[in-house]
A protein has these predicted regions:
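Conserved Rossmann-fold cofactor-binding substructure of NAD(P)-dependent oxidoreductases
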Residues: 5-26, 30-37
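ADP-ribose/adenylate-binding Rossmann-like module
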Residues: 29, 33, 42-63
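Active-site-lining helix/loop region of Rossmann-like oxidoreductase modules
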Residues: 100-192
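Residue-level detector of anion-binding/catalytic polar loops
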Residues: 26, 51, 79
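Gly/Ser/Thr-rich loops at beta-strand to alpha-helix junctions
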Residues: 59-61, 84-92, 116
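Rossmann-fold dehydrogenase core element
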Residues: 69-85, 105-109
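A short helix-to-beta-strand connector/capping loop
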Residues: 2-6, 76-78
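Rossmann-fold NAD(P)-binding glycine/threonine-rich loop
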Residues: 38, 56-78
Length: 192
């Protein structure tokens, strides 16, 4: 077995974050809201060439992170990887496997989760509230939330989605049963 040293720092303590980042290779952060606690952490990782991984489901934070830190991260070799949690990973890997099996892209895919255990963390609830407040306060944030390509490096390169929208209704599906929306689907469509 391999022993890994673990360093812990409060995200709102800039000096502690800086010290921690200077002494690590990979930083994993698992608590939001990232819009409150993540900017200086991503910035420090980008500056020091440290890889960064989070569970973020906040479109405004990720867009801001890309806009503010991509060039620096690219120059230092830091890999900034957002959205590595349940919100997106099963859909992302599922889409990759589906594409590899079919050998062609799809115009539309719906994912159904049969059984789900657990709950929503307080950090996720607070993150949702922060995103909602930001969207009400800033029309650009609201516009980005409704743009399925808001996190894409080239938003105009994606297919046109005229007439398509997220399906938020509860309905019966033949062979499946009753289905409803995944509460993170609006975010998930931006990263998968």
């Amino acid at each position: 077995t391999q022993h890994w040293d673990i360093a812990i720092a409060a995200a709102d303590d800039g000096d502690a974050v800086e010290h921690m980042v200077e002494h690590t290779k990979v930083l994993i952060t698992v608590i939001g809201p990232y819009s409150l606690y993540g900017d200086n952490v991503v910035a420090a990782c980008a500056r020091h060439g440290v890889d960064y991984v989070d569970l973020c489901g906040e479109v405004p934070f990720i867009r801001r992170s890309i806009d503010s830190h991509h060039a620096v991260a690219e120059s230092t070799g830091a890999r900034i990887v957002h959205s590595c949690g349940f919100d997106s990973v099963p859909s992302d890997i599922g889409m990759l496997n589906l594409y590899q099996a079919a050998g062609k892209p799809f115009a539309r895919v719906q994912m159904v989760v049969d059984k789900l255990k657990g709950g929503i963390s307080p950090g996720t609830i607070e993150s949702s509230l922060q995103v909602s407040h930001a969207a009400h306060a800033d029309k650009d944030v609201a516009r980005n939330l409704h743009n399925p390509y808001s996190l894409d490096p080239d938003p105009k390169a994606g297919p046109r989605l005229d007439g398509l929208q997220n399906d938020f209704e509860i309905k019966e599906v033949d062979g499946v049963g009753w289905v409803g929306p995944f509460f993170m689907s609006m975010f998930n469509t931006r990263v998968v």
